[in-house]
A protein has these predicted regions:
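A structural signal for multi-pass alpha-helical bundles of membrane permease subunits
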Residues: 8-318
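Short Lys/Arg-rich cationic patches that frequently serve as NLS/NoLS or arginine-rich RNA/DNA-binding motifs
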Residues: 1-9
Length: 318
C-alpha cells in the first residue's frame, strides 16, 4: 500500500516542474517589480528617506491626478458597456450566420452554404482588421479625419453650399476646427477605442457561443420557444462565465487607449482626454518616481477590488 502511494506521489510531482517556469516568469517580471513599486511608494526619491503615506496624500491632492482619474473613470464607464453590448450583438449575428451555413450543408444546398460561409469570413475580416493596424497608423488616420485641414472639415465645407443641413453646418463651423482640441475629442476617443477592440471581444464571445450545445436550441425550438426566449433563457445564462472574462479584459484593455492620444496630442492633450497614463508619463519625465509609485499602487488596488467584487457578485448569482 505504501509503495502504491509513493508511486502516485511520484506521478503527481512532475506537474510542479511544468508550473515552475511560469511561476518564475511571473515572479521576476510581475511580483518582484510590483513589490519594489510598493516599497518606493513609501520613500522619497531624492534622499531615500521614509515618508510613510505622504506620497499617497500628495497624489490625492494633485489636481492633474484628480482630473485624469475622473476622465479615466468616465472613459471606462462609457466605453465598456458600449463595447460589450455591440460586440455581443455582432457575435450572435455571426454565430447565426454560421448556424445557417451548417443547416444549408445538411440540406446539401451548396450555393447558399458558400454564401453564408463567405459572409461569415468577410465579417471576421472586417472586425479583426482594426486589431492588426498599428497605433502609429491609427494616429495617421485620426489626423487625416480630424485635423483642422482634415477630411471632416473638408466634408463640412463641401456641404456648406447646400441647402438645409449644409447651411446649419456653415453657421456652426465658421473656420477650420482641430477636433482633437475640442470637447468632441472624448467622443472621438471612445469611438476609436470601440472600433479598435471590438474584434477582440467578438472573438471571446464567439468562443462562449460555440461552447453552447446546439441540442439545447433544438429542444427549445421543438417546445415552441421563440428567438427572444431562446436568447434570454439559454444563450445569455450560458455566456455568464465568458462574460466575466470579457468584462475584466475589456477594462484592462481600456488603459491602452493612451498610446494613440499621446501620439496625436502629446503630454498635455485637451482636458477631456487627459488620462491617468498622461500623469504617469509626465511624472516619469520629471523623475517623480515616488508619486508615480504611489499612484500605481492605488490604481492596482482599485482594479483588484473591482475584480474581486465582480467575481463575488458572479458567484452569488450562480
Amino acid at each position: 500500500m505504501r509503495m502504491k502511494r509513493h508511486k502516485i506521489r511520484k506521478k503527481r510531482n512532475p506537474g510542479w516542474y511544468f508550473l515552475l517556469p511560469e511561476f518564475l516568469g511571473v515572479s521576476v517580471f510581475g511580483l518582484i517589480p510590483f513589490a519594489d513599486v510598493v516599497r518606493r511608494s513609501f520613500f522619497q526619491t531624492v534622499d531615500g528617506s521614509f515618508v510613510g503615506i505622504s506620497n499617497y496624500v500628495q497624489v490625492i491632492k494633485n489636481d492633474a491626478f484628480d482630473l485624469a482619474a475622473k476622465n479615466t473613470l468616465r472613459f471606462v464607464v462609457t466605453c465598456i458597456p458600449c463595447l460589450l453590448l455591440l460586440s455581443l450583438i455582432l457575435a450572435m449575428l455571426l454565430q447565426q450566420v454560421l448556424i445557417l451555413a451548417e443547416k444549408k450543408k445538411k440540406h446539401r444546398d451548396v450555393t447558399m452554404e458558400q454564401f453564408y460561409r463567405g459572409s461569415a469570413a468577410a465579417l471576421k475580416s472586417m472586425y479583426l482588421l482594426p486589431m492588426a493596424i498599428p497605433a502609429a497608423s491609427v494616429v495617421v488616420l485620426w489626423k487625416i479625419l480630424f485635423d483642422s485641414h482634415g477630411f471632416v472639415n473638408s466634408a463640412i465645407h463641401a456641404l456648406s453650399g447646400m441647402n438645409g443641413i449644409g447651411k446649419i453646418l456653415s453657421v456652426l463651423l465658421v473656420r477650420e476646427v482641430d477636433w482633437m482640441n475640442t470637447d468632441a475629442a472624448f467622443g472621438i476617443l471612445v469611438f476609436s477605442y470601440v472600433w479598435k477592440y471590438l474584434g477582440y471581444d467578438i472573438v471571446l464571445w464567439m468562443a462562449g457561443l460555440s461552447a453552447i450545445p446546439q441540442g439545447i436550441y433544438e429542444a427549445a425550438e421543438m417546445d415552441g420557444a421563440g428567438k427572444w426566449k431562446t436568447c434570454f433563457y439559454i444563450t445569455l445564462p450560458n455566456l455568464r462565465p465568458v462574460a466575466f472574462t470579457v468584462v475584466i479584459l475589456s477594462v484592462l484593455n481600456s488603459f491602452k487607449a493612451f498610446r494613440e492620444v499621446y501620439m496625436v496630442a502629446g503630454s498635455y492633450p485637451q482636458e477631456n482626454i487627459y488620462l491617468l497614463q498622461h500623469v504617469f508619463s509626465n511624472w516619469f519625465q520629471t523623475l517623480s518616481v515616488d508619486k508615480m509609485a504611489a499612484a500605481s499602487v492605488m490604481l492596482a488596488f482599485v482594479i483588484a477590488v473591482f475584480v474581486l467584487l465582480l467575481e463575488r457578485s458572479w458567484e452569488r448569482e450562480e
